[in-house]
């Protein structure tokens, strides 16, 4: 079903659209738009959640949407727990995340400079080096928590292992997650089959957000569309397919920017009759 956008950037279905509205599929704009038909997330415990595919929040299309949430006074904590099992010790960890040598260091650290945040305001949680108390203090003393991309199931496993789930779920600052870091913010998420995960699966997340699911790195592939339909049918929730240049902001309601596909779950007539 095609979606249409009115002058206030509200998205409606083709049945509700007027002649002067633009079709969502033809609408090339990075301005935020909202889904009026999506109910507010129940049990929202955190002020703001940001769901992305990339850490590059200094790119113009992301910056223009996040700049009102991030200020130069903020303190950032980066939680890189999403590495795969081939990272076995601190030496391996340093090759990915340490200053001066980590391949993912600058793409998580330097991106905050555009918002006026300097290096002294950014800390990293080191899975292999920090004690649990040190990890908790770094998280609690921050106003922005960055959850990195990679393996969502392994990230949740490590969060539980280090007894961090409760303080992350109840985090009162801005939570930014990309790819795996976006997925685990949900109470329940799915993993579509790909080169890293051969089988479809449901996984439990942090439980910060509920009432919907996401398909990150969305390309509208056959496998992704099959996964989306499976989730809609089995879980009875709507799914957002987030293209590489798309993102979501959950701040009391759901606001989307860039390119997404909204797959709404609709109760079938048969099911509705059964309920009645």
Which residues make up each language-model segment?
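Structural motif
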Residues: 6-7, 13-17, 35, 38, 51-56, 77, 144-148, ...
